């Protein structure tokens, strides 16, 4: 896997989408399977109830030792026709029974002499009217409901089919995305290899640039050496002054009042700096009152600051904390910050921030 944040992010998003699509597909298949099982169970119960209600119509038949699958479809059609006939007969009998039970008194049946009897004719006309109007209307409504049910069932079936196709298409798209992601990783690796090879070729084909870089490095080393020599001389002077002060304190000779006052002033000055201007990220703070300079270390970089009448007049940077190709820009940035004329503490903070932008040592 290429260590590219874009590719890694795409892979995470693709895996999450694939897991979500898989969960939805499994849920849809489970719902469809449950629906089919319920339909089969309902049909089974209906057939069993139909057989039980019409058991007298069926005669026992000796089952053959082997079942011929080719006759199943014909038997299903016969059973469907028989079911429709039974429904029709049952409805006719129930309708006639209810009609005779609630419309004609049992005492009047025996008094009907013939079909030409006025009462029979009246009832016949009423039945015909009921059949022509109400029953036809009800049959039409029933047919419409059946048609609506068929349409709704077909719509549900179409939606399930579309859902299955969508799940399958989503899986195919996920596979294509994985393939494209692999191709992107391969292209990224190839590009990185080409860039590295090109960088090597450029380095090999440009000895002048290498020589210039070596010269810049040597120049920086010389500046660093000069800085260290100046620092060493300052330390030697400080050591000599301290030895003189200690010799004056511990000896029996007359005390040098000027040296003692200078030491006390120097010590008070250092303490004042530490309490007022020191940033917590500054290390190895040293103050040189005679030369109006102070220096400290931050992230492997020695920072030498020269003070003038209006604040910081110059900032020098030395050390290995800043790469050679960035040292010139870093020196320019810190001196621009120093020239803004802000308070000393704020200027030091801004200089430290600029050093952070260029250093490689944390």
From Swiss-Prot:
* Claim: Transcription regulation is one of the keywords in the record: no
User: Under what name is this protein listed?
Assistant: Outer kinetochore KNL1 complex subunit KRE28
Q: Which residues form a coiled coil?
A: 6-62, 131-246
Task: Extract the Pfam families matched here.
Answer: Kre28 (PF17097)
**Keywords for this protein:** Centromere, Chromosome, Coiled coil, Kinetochore, Nucleus
- How does this polypeptide assemble, per the annotation? Component of the KNL1/SPC105 complex composed of SPC105 and KRE28. Part of the ten-subunit outer kinetochore KMN network that includes the KNL1, MIS12 and NDC80 complexes.
- Provide the family line: Belongs to the KRE28 family.
A GO cellular component annotated for this chain's UniProt record is: Knl1/Spc105 complex
Question: What organism does the record attribute this protein to?
Answer: Lachancea thermotolerans (strain ATCC 56472 / CBS 6340 / NRRL Y-8284)
> Which InterPro entries does this one have?
Kre28
UniProt keyword annotation of Nucleus present: yes
Q: Where is this protein localized, as stated in its record?
A: Nucleus; Chromosome, Centromere, Kinetochore
Q: What does this protein do?
A: Acts as a component of the outer kinetochore KNL1 complex that facilitates microtubule-kinetochore interactions and the spindle assembly checkpoint. Kinetochores, consisting of a centromere-associated inner segment and a microtubule-contacting outer segment, play a crucial role in chromosome segregation by mediating the physical connection between centromeric DNA and spindle microtubules.
Q: What is its main location?
A: nucleus
GO biological process assignments:
homologous chromosome orientation in meiotic metaphase I; regulation of meiosis I spindle assembly checkpoint
């Amino acid at each position: 896997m290429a260590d590219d944040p874009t590719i890694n992010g795409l892979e995470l998003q693709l895996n999450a989408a694939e897991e979500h699509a898989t969960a939805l597909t499994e849920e849809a298949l489970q719902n469809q399977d449950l629906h089919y099982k319920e339909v089969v169970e309902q049909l089974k119960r209906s057939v069993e109830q139909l057989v039980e209600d019409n058991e007298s119509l069926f005669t026992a038949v000796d089952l053959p030792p082997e079942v011929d699958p080719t006759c199943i479809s014909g038997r299903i059609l016969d059973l469907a026709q028989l079911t429709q006939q039974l429904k029709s007969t049952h409805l006719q009998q129930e309708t006639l029974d209810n009609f005779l039970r609630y419309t004609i008194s049992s005492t009047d049946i025996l008094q009907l002499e013939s079909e030409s009897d006025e009462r029979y004719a009246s009832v016949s006309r009423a039945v015909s009217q009921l059949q022509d109007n109400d029953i036809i209307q009800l049959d039409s409504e029933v047919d419409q409901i059946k048609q609506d049910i068929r349409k709704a069932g077909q719509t549900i079936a179409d939606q399930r089919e579309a859902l299955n196709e969508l799940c399958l298409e989503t899986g195919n798209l996920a596979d294509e995305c994985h393939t494209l992601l692999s191709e992107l990783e391969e292209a990224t690796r190839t590009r990185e290899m080409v860039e590295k090879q090109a960088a090597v070729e450029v380095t090999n084909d440009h000895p002048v640039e290498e020589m210039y870089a070596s010269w810049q490095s040597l120049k920086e080393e010389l500046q660093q050496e000069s800085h260290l020599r100046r620092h060493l001389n300052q330390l030697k002077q400080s050591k000599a002054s301290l030895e003189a002060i200690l010799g004056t304190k511990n000896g029996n000779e007359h005390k040098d009042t000027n040296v003692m006052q200078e030491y006390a002033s120097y010590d008070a000055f250092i303490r004042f700096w530490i309490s007022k201007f020191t940033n917590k990220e500054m290390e190895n703070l040293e103050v040189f009152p005679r030369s109006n300079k102070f220096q400290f270390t931050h992230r492997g970089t020695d920072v030498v600051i020269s003070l003038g009448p209006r604040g910081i007049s110059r900032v020098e940077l030395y050390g290995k904390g800043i790469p050679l190709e960035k040292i010139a820009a870093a020196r320019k940035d810190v001196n621009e910050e120093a020239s803004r004329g802000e308070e000393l503490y704020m200027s030091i903070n801004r200089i430290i921030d600029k050093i952070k932008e260029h250093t490689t040592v944390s």
